[in-house]
């Protein structure tokens, strides 16, 4: 008998929580980027949504959700710089592949008109990978 099942895919995004009070415009920017990323995932998988993580407590909650759902794979979207405490509690003790998704929103920044918030929100994700990979 053939049983149709969907892979359970844990999905979450991370950003450094300290940036958000300093640059409140990042919150809707990051939420929009995370929503857009989730929409790229096919409907042939079951998404277990860990949300946008900016603290170690949120990371732990996402990890608890992933463990309870017994996910098959995790996608982690890097929104901007974040420390390993944003990532590690969510993926520790999971015996599944973890894919770091590091996509810069724009092909190139308009440097003449870029401020700190737009740099952090639209152009810095690629600078965040080193520490994450080292900790994994």
Where are the predicted features?
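An N-terminal assembly and electron-transfer interface module characteristic of large anaerobic redox
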Residues: 1-136
């Amino acid at each position: 008998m053939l049983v149709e099942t969907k892979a359970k895919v844990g999905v979450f995004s991370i950003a450094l929580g300290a940036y958000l009070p300093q640059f409140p415009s990042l919150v809707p920017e990051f939420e929009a980027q995370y929503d857009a990323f989730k929409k790229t995932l096919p409907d042939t998988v079951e998404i277990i949504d860990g949300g946008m993580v900016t603290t170690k407590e949120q990371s732990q909650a996402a990890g608890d959700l992933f463990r309870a759902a017994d996910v098959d794979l995790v996608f982690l979207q890097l929104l901007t710089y974040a420390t390993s405490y944003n990532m590690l509690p969510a993926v520790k003790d999971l015996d599944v592949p973890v894919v770091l998704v590091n996509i810069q929103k724009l092909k190139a920044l308009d440097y003449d008109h870029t401020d700190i918030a737009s740099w952090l929100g639209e152009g810095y994700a690629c600078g965040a990978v080193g520490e994450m990979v080292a900790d994994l």
